[in-house]
From Swiss-Prot:
Residues 1-46, 95-132 are annotated as: Disordered. The lineage of its organism: Eukaryota, Metazoa, Chordata, Craniata, Vertebrata. It comes from the Eukaryota. Residues 40-100 form the SH3 domain. The keyword Cytoplasm applies. Belongs to the nephrocystin-1 family. This is Nephrocystin-1. GO terms for biological process: cell differentiation; cell projection organization; protein localization involved in establishment of planar polarity; spermatogenesis. The SH3 domain mediates the stable interaction with Cas. The modification Phosphotyrosine is found at Y182, Y554. Residues 2-48 form a coiled coil. Pfam families: SH3_1. Interacts with Crk-associated substrate BCAR1, NPHP4, PTK2B/PYK2 and tensin. Interacts with INVS and NPHP3. Interacts with AHI1 and TNK2. Interacts with NPHP4 in a complex containing NPHP1, NPHP4 and RPGRIP1L/NPHP8. Interacts with IQCB1; the interaction likely requires additional interactors. Interacts with KIF7. Interacts with ANKS3. Interacts with SPATA7. Interacts with FLNA. It comes from Canis lupus familiaris. Keywords: Cell junction, Cell projection, Cilium, Cilium biogenesis/degradation, Coiled coil, Cytoplasm, Cytoskeleton, Differentiation, Phosphoprotein, SH3 domain, Spermatogenesis, Tight junction.
Amino acid sequence: GEEEDEEEEEEEESEEGGGEEEESEEEEEEKQENESHHQATSKEYIAVGDFTAQQAGDLTFKKREILLIIEKKPDGWWIAKNAKGNKGLIPRTYVEPYNKEEGQDTSEEEDSEEDVEVGDQTAGGEEVKQRTDSHWSAVQKAISEQINTVDVLTTMGAIPAGFRPSTLFQLLEEGNQFRASYFLQPELTPSQLAFRDLMWDAKTGTIRSRPSRVSFILTLWSCKMIPLPGTSIQVLSRHVRLCIFDGNKVLSNIHTVRATWQSKKPKTWTFSPQVTGILPCLLDGDCFIRSNSSSPDLGILFELGISYIRNSTGERGELSCGWVFLKLFDASGIPIPAKTYELFLNGGTPYEKGVEVDPSVSRRAYGSVFHQMMTMRRQPQLLVKLRSLNRRSRDLLSLLPETLIGSMCTIHLLIFYRQILGDVLLKDRTSMQSADLISNPVLATFPKLLEQPDMMDALRSSWAEKESTLKRSEKRDKEFLKAMFLLVYHDCVVPLLHSTLLPPFRWAEEETEAARWKVIADFLKQNQENGGALQALLSPDGVHEPFDISEQTYDLLGEIRKNVA
């Protein structure tokens, strides 16, 4: 398995590292013989920051000093020589290629050579095809703009060498094509005359269930040994972002689960904490995973991240603290077993290879098995559990879109949405060729809730309350339940979404989150006391945004997913 491979690699590395002192004299002679050869092959690099030796064998250097790289080790610590002829280990994140002609600016040729050096293999270990899709080049540009800040933080020692700007956050910022609200929409067939993943079942009087190649439940357990950033940055959120990935492309929405963190166990992150009332869906570690991609290299990409603010400048940012790719099928196409997986994290971005999250952990692992075991225990890791589905879960998941990742605690609400979509688009539409605007507030606004988890929680708690008052016979009546759901939605979500009292949703801003939750909680309490939203809607205190037709209108052609061949 992957873990064994990693252990073997570590053993090799540590054997190389073992007995350093005894070998040093022989090495010295060998290096003198090879000096001229190294001179020819090695490149000059310029330091982007000051570095002070952390232990014997490291090379101290100052910013803008020119260093000759003698050997590039895969653990991120390179052997370098300074102008005085002193040699030692340096962290690769502190240097960049030096171009004599242009001073510090590196030539394009050098850059591309560097890219090949770190990027010729993907998370799955396959060769990378040259990325041409425009969103990827935009992401690379955005990440390269952030790299300067991250370099500064790394140089200051504020973050470990393997941290990077978050790749998945950048994709989410690009537009809506990696958001759950996009994947929740139906997709047309290539002919554009029918829906590919939304069909009517006349026998049951609702939408037809659809199997998917990948359909299971995954539980995020915990993250261990995650290195801490320094005190110069304040962490606003710790989270895991996950998506379907084929080693090259993101093939689903990017789902985010926020971790719970306690200062008494600073290197451990946990999920699904015990809370009074309902567990917020943002903290729910139980996720459903659906994908119908036929790629043989299909898997889940996990990226651990932090949202931070720099104390000195007030600048905000998103960092990746490591990533791991779990392939879902073996070489012969058989799905991996449902069990708990202990996944060791990689540093860098998913398009780099051989970068450690924190190289200082394993760079001096000695040869003994005990040392290796200790080193393995100190490696950053993510624990996840793949669950096999019982019949009820399988039936529920098959009512969802073919490709979607989301929180298990919202699944019943997503199914209501899909069933209402089926009623409106398949059962009640006057003509299947009609693409007129449809008046339906639920269809028009529900996808927004997927980008505002606190609003989804408001709907969940209102629905749970309503459901608790229903008789058993009513709960079995699908049409009655749907009608009740529509009532709850109009009472709870519609007024809140357009209230001026509700500040816009902002990720990882504590004051905004608290202010929003107060408005939501007060409104739900009022509804409970008054038996509905009418009083709140008519109250002079409830100020609403000017009415916009989009609150009511479902634009079929505007909302459907574009068929990407």
